[in-house]
């Protein structure tokens, strides 16, 4: 049986309800197809490019990170910016990103 991004998210949110997060916490699925298959999940503190590179190196299909990628309004995710590079790399390699600031 294949595990999906949606199933991983559901399991996380059943164990660590989103309602426990503060109002300002940026939690949830940032990118990734909920129907995509997940075989390996990488847990990290920060969703930075070095973590994405590690996910690629170990064959992770999903990253669960503690700190948010975007905490305030975003005006660009152009790949010339650090956060934009993260987003573009995740999407181009089909890696899902789930954020859970306080509640995990």
How should each PLM-predicted stretch be described?
Residues 7, 11, 54, 89:
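Alpha-helical scaffold segments in soluble metabolic enzymes
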Residues 1-39:
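N-terminal glycine-rich anion-binding loop in soluble enzyme alpha/beta folds
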Residues 45-80, 93-96:
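Short HxH-centered metal-ligating active-site micro-motif
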Residues 102-104:
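Conserved small/polar residues in nucleotide/adenosyl-binding loops
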Residues 82-90:
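Catalytic-core regions built around general acid/base machinery
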Residues 98-100:
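Polyanion-binding loop/helix "lid" in catalytic or ligand-binding cores
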């Amino acid at each position: 049986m294949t595990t999906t991004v949606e199933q991983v998210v559901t399991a996380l949110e059943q164990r660590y309800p989103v309602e426990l997060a503060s109002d300002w916490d940026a939690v949830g699925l940032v990118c990734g197809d909920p129907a995509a298959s997940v075989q390996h999940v990488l847990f990290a503190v920060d969703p930075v490019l070095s973590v994405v590179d590690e996910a690629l190196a170990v064959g992770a299909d999903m990253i669960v990170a503690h700190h948010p990628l975007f905490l305030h309004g975003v005006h660009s995710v152009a790949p010339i910016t650090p956060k934009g590079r993260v987003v573009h790399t995740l999407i181009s390699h089909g890696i899902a990103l789930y954020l859970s600031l306080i509640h995990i």
